[in-house]
């Protein structure tokens, strides 16, 4: 059996896994993505490929209001656990920075939409 050594092994080719792989490659790491299905994209491949990141500069430039307090209330209602509070805040704080990083360092371009297709 042949072996290959990589800096980052990503299990699953959904949006999160592919984003991790892209960032690692941008930062100079060797990456391998393993996906069990014949299609990359995970659930985004069947959901119009949309992501929701409240407070992004892309939405702000398009004049789309997406106040963080409303997003915070929505997430708290959907992920109603004390242990999830830190994760929700991390998402709200870093999500917009991730989109900016990807646009700045790759060919990825995010197109804001007022509503899901």
Name these PLM-found stretches.
Residues 36-117:
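Conserved N-terminal/central alpha/beta ligand/cofactor-binding core
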Residues 8-33:
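N-terminal Rossmann-like FAD-binding beta1-loop-alpha1 element of flavoenzymes
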Residues 1, 28-30, 49, 102:
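Polar low-complexity intrinsically disordered regions
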Residues 2-6:
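Core beta-strand elements of the Rossmann-like FAD/NAD(P) dinucleotide-binding domain
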């Amino acid at each position: 059996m042949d072996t290959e050594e990589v800096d980052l092994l990503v299990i699953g080719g959904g949006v999160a896994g592919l984003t991790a792989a892209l960032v690692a490659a941008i930062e100079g790491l060797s990456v391998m993505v393993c996906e069990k299905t014949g299609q990359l994209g995970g659930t985004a491949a069947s959901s119009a490929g949309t992501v929701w990141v409240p407070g992004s500069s892309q939405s702000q430039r398009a004049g789309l209001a997406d106040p963080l307090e409303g997003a915070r209330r929505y997430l708290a209602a959907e992920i109603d656990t004390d242990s999830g509070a830190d994760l929700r805040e991390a998402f709200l704080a870093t999500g917009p920075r991730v989109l900016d990083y990807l646009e700045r360092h790759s060919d990825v371009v995010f197109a804001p939409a007022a509503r899901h297709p």
